Amino acid sequence: MPQRDLNHLFVVTYGRSGSTLLMGVLNTIPGFLIRGENRDALHHLYRFHSTMLAESNRGPKRKLNQPTHPFFGIAGFPAQKSLRQIRRLATDTVLRPDEDTRVTGFKEIRWYQQDLEEYVAWLQQVFPSARFLVNTRNHEDVLKSKWWAEGEDKSEHLADIERRILTLAESLGDAAYRVHYDDYVADPVALRGMFEWLGEPFDEATVRETMAVRHSI
């Protein structure tokens, strides 16, 4: 069965940033289905693909194709087929779009891996034309919340995560857009620019209604 022509949107953020509320707002848009977190599950698929790709180029293909070689057959790793099949796997098991879904994706708070840039570049290979929505929040409020407040001070860790995802957003150009929780909670109209970036009409009444409902419960 041919894969559907879907657009993809990924929310890039950190824990306790209000991203569940943002997910709720995005899902008010007709045809949008943005899933919640998956504990960075796709990163394991990235590591599989990148490992196989690197090992398939570990030496001359003539030697790697010899049945006496320890890595016999690895040179035949079909990189493009791997990308297609990973896209199908993620679509069928993680995203699970509805019949009327036009844009799908997920929000994730675990973007702190050291290979962040390489991982996102790979996501763009798996999901061509994917876009990335970066969500931030006032650090003082984040650090007071839940596990951020437990144990030793985590302010430097939070600052480093935000610095990296903002640098990522800048490197992605028009494929990325930034929103700030404190701005759109204070005034939902602050999200108008996000809707314009998405190419979708801004329904202020629906956004306000959604934001009046408690999320992340």
Predicted regions and their residues:
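Domain-wide signal for the mature, well-folded portions of proteins, strongly enriched
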Residues: T91-P97
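PAPS-dependent sulfotransferase catalytic domain
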Residues: R47, T51-P60, P97-E204
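PAPS-dependent sulfotransferase catalytic core
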Residues: M1-L89, E204-T206, T210-I217
